[in-house]
UniProtKB/Swiss-Prot annotation:
Pfam families found in the cross-reference section: EF-hand_7
Recorded name of the encoding gene: CAM
Family the UniProt entry places it in: Belongs to the calmodulin family.
Remaining remarks: This protein has four functional calcium-binding sites.
Function: Calmodulin mediates the control of a large number of enzymes, ion channels and other proteins by Ca(2+). Among the enzymes to be stimulated by the calmodulin-Ca(2+) complex are a number of protein kinases and phosphatases.
GO molecular function: calcium ion binding
Alphabetized Gene3D superfamilies for the sequence: EF-hand
The protein's name in its UniProt record: Calmodulin
Organism annotation: Helianthus annuus
Residues at which Ca(2+) 2 binds: 57, 59, 61, 63, 68
Domain EF-hand: start-end pairs: 8-43, 44-79, 81-116, 117-149
Keywords per UniProt: Acetylation, Calcium, Metal-binding, Methylation, Repeat
Length: 149
């Protein structure tokens, strides 16, 4: 499954993996998964976190390593039921629920994920996605960016 990913995708997933793997030991624990999900405004129970880990934990050691993470991401990308997931992700970014992601909202989410971005980097991300040039990202623009990945 993961062998169908491009070099770019793999390096992006490596970056995402390291956001979860807070202590850098190469494994994502339920605690680390919980930290990231809570920073995104979710509130999973310990049992839900354990279920999520178990779902992808191929070797049964109770954590997710990078190959397992890659398989999960490859499966998610193939999953055509991504419309609902995209809406959910958009809502995470769109803090005030006005239908747009502003630079401030983007910065807020990225900071919560542990990504310290300069104003220039945030503006650049907005510009890349902002097709109609209004300085923010609407849902259609968000979908385009997410599907291009």
């Amino acid at each position: 499954m993961a062998d169908q990913l491009t070099e770019d995708q793999i390096s992006e997933f490596k970056e995402a993996f390291s956001l979860f793997d807070k202590d850098g030991d190469g494994c994502i624990t339920t605690k680390e998964l919980g930290t990231v999900m809570r920073s995104l405004g979710q509130n999973p129970t310990e049992a839900e976190l354990q279920d999520m880990i178990n779902e992808v934990d191929a070797d049964g050691n109770g954590t997710i390593d990078f190959p397992e993470f890659l398989n999960l991401m490859a499966r998610k990308m193939k999953d055509t039921d991504s419309e609902e997931e995209l809406k959910e992700a958009f809502r995470v970014f769109d803090k005030d629920q006005n239908g747009f992601i502003s630079a401030a909202e983007l910065r807020h989410v990225m900071t919560n994920l542990g990504e310290k971005l300069t104003d220039e980097e945030v503006d650049e991300m907005i510009r890349e996605a902002d097709v109609d040039g209004d300085g923010q990202i609407n849902y259609e623009e968000f979908v385009k960016v997410m599907m291009a990945k």
